[in-house]
Each structure stands twice: as C-alpha cells, then as structure tokens.
Amino acid sequence: MRLTILLLLVVQQIARPASAADTAAVAPWKINTPIVTYWAGPALTDAVARQMAEGGWNLVWCGEKQLDVAQRHGLRAQLQDGLLRPETLDNPAQREKLDALIARVRNHPALYSYFITDEPGAAEFPALGKLVAYLRQRDPAHLAYINLFPTYASNQQLGTKGDKVTAYQDHLRQYVEIVKPSLVSYDHYQFAKGGDNPDYFLNLAMIRRAAQGARVPFLNIVQACTWTPSMRVPGPDELRYLVYTTLAYGGQGISYYVYCHPGHTGGIALPDGRPTPLYHALKSLNRQFVAIARELQPLRSLAVYHAGMSPPGSVQLPREAPFRFDPPVAPLAYRPSERVRGFVLGYFGKDEKPTHMVAVNLDYKAEAAVWLIGPGNLEAFDAKAGTWSATGGVRLELRLPPGGGKLVRVAK
C-alpha cells in the first residue's frame, strides 16, 4: 500500500499543471541554434528524421508520440496537437487536458515549440494573445509558433484597411502589440512561371522592421515547390538566393514550403521518400545558413542596402557607406516580374557601429565579381568550414555564385 501511494503521488506530480513557482526559475525561450525547418512534411519516422538531420534541418514537426524519434536523431521538435488552439481555454475540460499535455511534454529534451496556427486575421489576435500568454506562463522555455500572411494577402484576409503597405503594416503592428510573439514568422512565395513577384524585398523589409521593433527574431518561409500551374519549381540557385537574402536582412530562421505534400511538385522529397535535387543543394546551404546566422546572432541588424536594381521596399546603398563597392555598382532600371539584379548589403554590429556585413549577388542566373571596401582591415567567413580568414587589407574581391553571398567583418 505504501508503495502504491508513493507511485500515485509521483504520477500526480508529473501530470499536474505547472504553477508560477514551477516556472519562476525557468529561463524564457531563446532561439539558440538558428532554425532550419519546413512546412508540410511526412510523418516523422526514424527514416524521415535521419534524412532531415543529414540534410541540415534542425526543427521537425511531430505529435507527442514522435518526440522520442526527434530526440534519437538530435532534432528539435515543434509539437502539433488539437488542444493547441484558443478555443481550448474556453472549455474547462479541454483546458485541463491542455494543462496535462504541457505537463507531460515540457521537460522532453526534444521539445522546442508549440504550433498554434497559420495565417490568422487581425480579429483572431486577441484570442491568440491569450493562448500565447497561457503557454508562456506554464512553459516559458518553449516557443508558441504562429505564421503570418505575406504582403499579397487581401485586406479581408489581413483584417485591416488601406493600401497594401498600410494594411500590412497595421496587421504587423496589431500582431506584435496584441499577441506579443517571441518570434515573427511569415511566408512569401514569388517564383511564378511568368516572372518573380515584385514584393519579396518589401515583405522582407517590413517583417525585419516589425521584428526589430518587438526585439524578437524572425523566420522566413520560402518557396521550394509549385502547387498551381501559375507557379514554378525553383532551382538550387534560386534557393541559394532565398537563403542568403534572408541572412542579409537579419533572419534567424528559414523554412521551406514544402518538404513533401500531396498536390505539390518539387519540394525536398518525393512521395516515396527519395530526395529531390533541392534536398542535395540544401544539404550544404542549410549548414551555411546556420553558420552565418550564428555569427550574426549576438549582433543587431543595422541596415540593409541595395545596389543595382531598386525593387519595392529597397533602400539604395549610400555613396559613402562604411561597406561599399569600388567601383560603385551602376543603377539598373527595375521592371516588375523580372528577376532582381545587383547586390544586397546587410550591415550588422553593436552600438549602431557596423562591424559585419553580408553581401549577396541577387542574380540567381549568373556569377558576379565585385570589389568591396570596408571601414578597416577585412576578414572573410568560410560558411562551409566555419572559420574566419584575414584578407590583407580594407579591399576585398568578392566572387559570388548565382544568388550566393559572403559574410565579412572588420578585423578585431
């Protein structure tokens, strides 16, 4: 009987909801390793998890029963469960089940985040804010993940009024003020058969500003497939462009739509599990993303400048900028739907002083060579090796592959 009572007490302790005392000493969620994930993938088996880990993905989607699978392969897990929705809080019985779920999973080594919803309108923000606060109170160590609409969503979808920029700005403002997220995530798919959506950089810039205002990181969900005759499957060079432009704008997470899902062509894996050409390309790019984003994580994104074409949302590189091209890159006329050509320079540093810079060749169809001048002796980062090397002066020739980039810094 004494043993039975002891076991009962242990079970009750494990299953009981977290109290304020339980979570007072728990550190709040931090992004830690930059995120590489996906949207819409297969059920998480050992074979799938092994493929994802080998490909450089580090955050997988799963249910409670698959958390152990993620752990076996050194992966972080985003939990999906029907209880993780605002309506649960309005039903005492469902809320009790949610509390029990949190109590069961919050100490699992693989748990990283809770998936809440995709593309909510502004009218849903108050209820989502309550759920995010509820989860944060009971499990502050794990992220409550919500993904937002892109700029091309309608005003009806966004739940705001005005022109495209005004409506989207208001949508983002309400989101960060009401929901108070720990990370801002959005999706934007621009590769159409008739050309490229012109607002990719506008969306990046607006998300960057919103995340900076909230002092949280952001994640970019990018296109890796087609799901309709009007869109095209991007190639490896276009994926490189998405990876490096996300880095230049200060992104700390990237996600690919889709990994593998019915009704979609391309993606990362085929329905039978075999990897696509994009998987093999991303195997290296994913690791480059993490390596560069980790170097930039202690810093602040200070500015983003374009040289060459000026797509919507871009700011042209000032002539006397701390990091600049020599000779300067000539301005190019931009016409919507054509691919953007030129360069992006993302400045990073502390105390408003740029010490690091990510340069990106925006032409995903051609290599580029350009001379860069910095505010001091420069060092270049090898994203594949994870090492820095001196360049011998303040000038550096950058030879960038299609859509590729380079991280440089002022020597310490």
Residues covered by each model-derived region:
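Glycan-processing catalytic domains of CAZymes
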Residues: A21-G376, A380-K412
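Bacterial N-terminal signal peptides
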Residues: R2-Q13
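Universal eukaryotic N-terminal targeting presequences
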Residues: M1-R2, A53
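Sec/Tat signal peptide C-region and signal peptidase I cleavage site
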Residues: R16-S19
